[in-house]
Amino acid sequence: IPAFKLHASGYLMKPVSAKDVQVEIDNIKGIRQNQKPLTVKCFGTFEVYAKGEKLTFKRSKTKELFAFLVDRNGAGVTVAEIGVALWENDEDQKNQNYIHQLFRDLRQSLEAVGVEEIFERNNYFYSINPEKLDCDYYEHLKTGKPEFHGEYMSQYSWAEETCGLLWKKRT
């Protein structure tokens, strides 16, 4: 049946009964409940969605910090590494203090949508838990699906390294 090629969540054939409709609705509800609470789009420009709504951050650097942690795919990074990435090789102490403000803002933004457990701290290392995100980049790494079309977090210069690796892998 051609409709299955559309990757539909369900399909009803005539004659349709109320029971058939209810089965399909329950199936869709089950799919939605199994979805991860945060959706992250890395290909193109970086965006974050919570329950279908774009997540807003108090500061643009907070969003960039979250993008950097997503790019690291669960690997822990230090405040110094974050400072070098976000301020392009400027290890100014003032920036390191500002990073702690960004961490607070990130925690508050995640708490506001009930997903604060995504952000993790282990001694001096900060990371996110990739298992709690629905992320196009992570999906691409797992499955190799051709979702990458040349742009990766295009608003951040530090993401060019990952973009280059994705291009290399593509060819």
Where are the regions that the model predicts?
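Alpha4-beta5-alpha5 "output face"
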Residues: I1-K5
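Intrinsically disordered, low-complexity protein-interaction/activation regions
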Residues: V16-Q22, D26-T171
